Amino acid sequence: DREAAKIIASLYRTELVEADGNPDMVQVLSPYRVNTEAGVHALNKQLREIANPASVKAEQWNAGSWTFRIGDKVMQTKNVDNISNGDIGRVVQISRKKDGNRQMQVDFGDEKRMYQEEDLEDLEFAYATSVHKSQGAEYPVVILPVLKCFYPMLRRDIYYTGITRAKTRVHLVGSKSALAIAISRTNIGMRNTMLAERIRAEAKRQEYVPQTKAA
């Protein structure tokens, strides 16, 4: 998974340049959140430094294990006020209140929310997100790891969901053998549909399938 993570970062950098630096145009999806370098948490650390590197001029907020910067792409992780679990926004302001404590404003498009320090646990970076969290969303470009170390999550429905989030192109990072496993496996009790054929068709449409030793 380490080699796959490197390839994902390289693809992300290339696609970000093509998107004029707009991270909303490129989304990395992973079936796993933790316990792998190709999971959501580990990938976010890499991708954030590509999309929004530290700058001496840019305001940032060190809060525990998190460091937020102006321009960061973040996701709300629970329902609150008019912001829903899974909503993605951008950090637009980091400031200090009169009492000296910091606060941070996130723009979600239709809504803006001001976060205090105790609210930050409701946020996580969103350069990479889980396939599950991506349901109902669409992105011009999707990058999706498909590795044998993901075996419990190598399922037809999961990868069909991930692949079909892409409006323009999708990059599958891993191996064709891992993809074959995903196509052959489905949820217990899931109806017999045309998902296998559709996922093969979507995979054929992709621009590039890099092979990795991690697969």
Please provide the spans of the model-predicted regions:
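C-terminal accessory regions
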Residues: 87-215
